[in-house]
């Protein structure tokens, strides 16, 4: 049995400036107000004044461990994550988290958060295989939770960092966006916003199978790069989203300075040419999606002889559906893959909808005026 009153009294004497906080903890503990005590401890462990040295480890050993069985499991893990940060030996931290996981197994969210913390530690020490296995286990558990919870953001932060470490651009792009979707970006320091926006932008450009940039372009995190020396990345992303090959080539003096982009120039060119074909299809009226080889060649900056190969590539990866008329050198498109649109593309849709409404009104007037002739 630990001497909790003695520890609290000693702590009050050791730090006169924080005596009121320690006194409050003692008061709530003595009154057995476990919920209020939990909230007070959560505030306590996040206070930089107390999060120094091994103070939180001592707090856990001499105080929290005495009533942890009365604490909400998820709140307990939240508290313990702060304690673990003061453990310099990863092995000790991992053992501590494993024991905690057993204590909170009644709550799926608490177990998920605990496993995510274990995965983060494994990633930090370079154990990629165990990190991968942990991510797969946790993802399966997350899929069974209703809606988005407080543990989702921590999981997506871990999974995106893992994919970044192994160089899987497409998976990083997907999960890093999910992470941002679970938090308020204003809570991140500007420097972190800029770093996340930059790595996300690069991953989107380089990611295999990533043809949807609308969600990133509409996210406020990207604004952190505006009016900085990385503004060129925003311009490049907008060029890709609209399939503007000419703008992409004009920006080469900027993106060409980035080693990863420069090394993958051929891949980037093919991707933006495919996006150009998608945009050409999307902006055409549904009843007029006949594209000539010459039109495609001009917009995508390819030769007429290369058009058929470009269209076949777009068809094979499921970006568009349609058929190629080799004799007339035309492509008839019937479908284009849905994407998140930027504001300019939404405006284009609005204009086309207004044009369609005008057509409908004209037909209505025609029928109204000539109904007698038609019926007789």
From Swiss-Prot:
Belongs to the proteasome subunit S11 family. Keywords: Proteasome. The keyword Transferase does not apply. The keyword 4Fe-4S does not apply. This is 26S proteasome non-ATPase regulatory subunit 13. It holds the Pfam family PCI. One of its GO terms (biological process) is ubiquitin-dependent protein catabolic process. GO terms for cellular component: cytosol; nucleus; proteasome accessory complex; proteasome regulatory particle, lid subcomplex. PANTHER family: 26S PROTEASOME NON-ATPASE REGULATORY SUBUNIT 13. SUPFAM superfamilies: Winged helix' DNA-binding domain. Component of the 26S proteasome, a multiprotein complex involved in the ATP-dependent degradation of ubiquitinated proteins. This complex plays a key role in the maintenance of protein homeostasis by removing misfolded or damaged proteins, which could impair cellular functions, and by removing proteins whose functions are no longer required. Therefore, the proteasome participates in numerous cellular processes, including cell cycle progression, apoptosis, or DNA damage repair. It comes from Gallus gallus (Chicken). Component of the 19S proteasome regulatory particle complex. The 26S proteasome consists of a 20S core particle (CP) and two 19S regulatory subunits (RP). The regulatory particle is made of a lid composed of 9 subunits including PSMD13, a base containing 6 ATPases and few additional components. One of its GO terms (molecular function) is structural molecule activity. InterPro entries: PCI_dom, PSD13_N, PSMD13, WH_DNA-bd_sf. Residues 171-338 form the PCI domain. It comes from the Eukaryota.
């Amino acid at each position: 049995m630990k001497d909790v009153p003695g520890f609290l009294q000693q702590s009050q004497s050791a730090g006169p400036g924080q005596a009121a906080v320690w006194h409050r903890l003692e008061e709530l503990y003595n009154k057995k107000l476990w919920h209020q005590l939990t909230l007070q401890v959560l505030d306590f462990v996040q206070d930089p004044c107390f999060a120094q040295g091994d103070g939180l480890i001592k707090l856990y050993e001499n105080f929290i461990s005495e009533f942890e069985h009365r604490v909400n499991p998820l709140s307990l893990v939240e508290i313990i994550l702060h304690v673990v940060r003061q453990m310099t030996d990863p092995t000790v931290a991992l053992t501590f988290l494993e024991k905690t996981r057993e204590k909170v197994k009644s709550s799926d969210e608490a177990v998920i958060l605990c496993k995510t913390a274990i995965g983060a530690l494994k990633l930090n020490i370079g154990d990629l295989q165990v990190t991968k296995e942990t991510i797969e286990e946790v993802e399966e558990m997350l899929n069974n939770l209703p809606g988005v919870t407080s543990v989702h953001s921590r999981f997506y932060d871990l999974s995106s960092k893992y994919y970044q470490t192994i160089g899987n651009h497409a998976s990083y792009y997907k999960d890093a966006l999910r992470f941002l979707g679970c938090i308020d970006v204003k809570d991140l320091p500007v420097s972190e916003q800029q770093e996340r926006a930059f790595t996300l932008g690069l991953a989107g450009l380089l990611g295999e199978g990533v043809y949807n940039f609308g969600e990133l372009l509409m996210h406020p995190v990207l604004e952190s790069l505006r009016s900085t020396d990385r503004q060129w990345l925003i311009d490049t992303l907008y060029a890709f989203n609209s399939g503007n090959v000419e703008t992409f080539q004009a920006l080469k003096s900027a993106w060409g300075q980035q080693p990863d982009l420069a090394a993958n120039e051929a891949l980037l060119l093919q991707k933006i040419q495919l996006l150009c074909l998608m945009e050409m299809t999307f902006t055409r009226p549904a009843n007029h999606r006949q594209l000539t080889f010459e039109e495609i060649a001009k917009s995508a900056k390819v030769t007429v002889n290369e058009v058929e190969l470009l269209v076949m590539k777009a068809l094979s990866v499921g970006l568009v559906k349609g058929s190629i008329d080799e004799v007339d050198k035309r492509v008839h498109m019937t479908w284009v893959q849905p994407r998140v649109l930027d504001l300019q593309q939404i405006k284009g849709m609005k204009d086309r909808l207004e044009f369609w409404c005008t057509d409908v009104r004209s037909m209505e007037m025609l029928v109204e005026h000539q109904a007698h002739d038609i019926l007789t």
